[in-house]
Amino acid sequence: MKIKFYTFLLGLFMVNGLFAQTTVIDSIIHDGIYRNYRLYVPAAYNGSTAVPLVLNLHGYTSNATEQQFYGNFMPQADANNFLLVMPNGTRDNQNQTFWNAFGGSGPDDVGFLSALIDSLNATYNVNLNRVYSTGMSNGGFMSYKLACMLSNRIAAIASVTGTMSTIELNNCTPTRPVPVMEIHGTADATVPYNGGTGFTPIPNVMSYWVNHNNCNPVADSADVPNTNTTDGCTAKHYVWSGGDNGSTVEHYKIIGGGHTWPGAAINIGVTNQDFDASAEIWRFFSQYALTGVNAVNELPSKSAFTVYPNPSAEDFTLSFDNTSAKTVTLINAVGQVVQRFTVTGNQVIVSPSAAGLYFVTICLGDNLWSKKIVKN
């Protein structure tokens, strides 16, 4: 995927130049090959606390710079204090940039990305239990390959317009449940939703991970509110929950969507604008660590959290076992914060104004727990 938006990028570089200290351009040598990358360091990072790391992988023929601004996670990194790295792939025999995600011989990109994690951790304070991978197209393929081959290091993955090659699917050997999110358009002509030569259909990919993670076989689903009626597409959100170690599988099906990143400011085809893919991917990632949900998504037992009634046509009551101060955040299906407040009692009521799927997150110290609620 080549993104033709150099004029747009020039303006972004001019703005980013005011804060040049936040983007580091560096490289490592792996297997005798010079491999470079861009690292975005949020202003909140001070090195005193270990922070998550997100790998953001470009598509075929694209590069780290284009991916930084097209699949833009910088607002999420700023708001949530995580490191964001955009590495470059190598060049294939057509002299195009790519990730070796298709099972053939060539550069050891799994080894490179593992070495990159180590290199970054040597310089920065990385929480190695919270390393995630996402990517566009070929970068999505590569994220799936990491889920298969580097599941001991990658806590969760998300693919936008990617899939798994049939070779990789048949040889996938993850050593633990891996939370997976796929965002894909039904009108994607580059990586067809229903598969093609060597490309696994998206429903089959979802089934593989639902089975591997031992999730509930039937998904909860909800239409994403069609807030932008001129973008030429709509979206539906599927969640397979109940997996081992708290794992889930999520899928955003973009009905009529093309080979594009939802919410992107750069239009390279039919792009869904009803939700922000980057915000949703971070919402998904933030629930998980290598140990499952324990490190980032589970309150201590003395602070149990329940929601009732659920589903509800009106209000939801949140109940806690103690009165420790907690931050309550209500997030809608498109990743927007609807409510956020602090509570010190053992009960509080939340009242979403519109029907739909929401996520309630409770933050207590370093712990974050999320539950899904549905307003009828």
Describe the residue ranges of each PLM region.
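Bacterial Sec-dependent N-terminal signal peptides
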Residues: 1-23, 293-296, 310, 319, ...
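C-terminal tail/sorting-segment detector
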Residues: 355-376
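Serine-hydrolase catalytic machinery in alpha/beta-hydrolase-like enzymes
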Residues: 24-132, 145, 149, 171, ...
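A domain-start/cap signature at the N-terminus of enzymes
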Residues: 18-53, 134-158, 164, 204, ...
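Short, glycine-anchored, charge-dense loop/turn motifs used at functional sites
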Residues: 330-338, 358
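Residue-level detector of functionally pivotal "anchor" positions at catalytic/ligand-binding pockets or at interdomain
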Residues: 218, 289-308, 314, 321-323, ...
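Short beta-strand/loop motif that positions the catalytic acidic residue
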Residues: 182-184, 188
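A glycine-anchored, Pro-Gly-centered beta-turn/N-cap motif
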Residues: 24, 314, 354-357
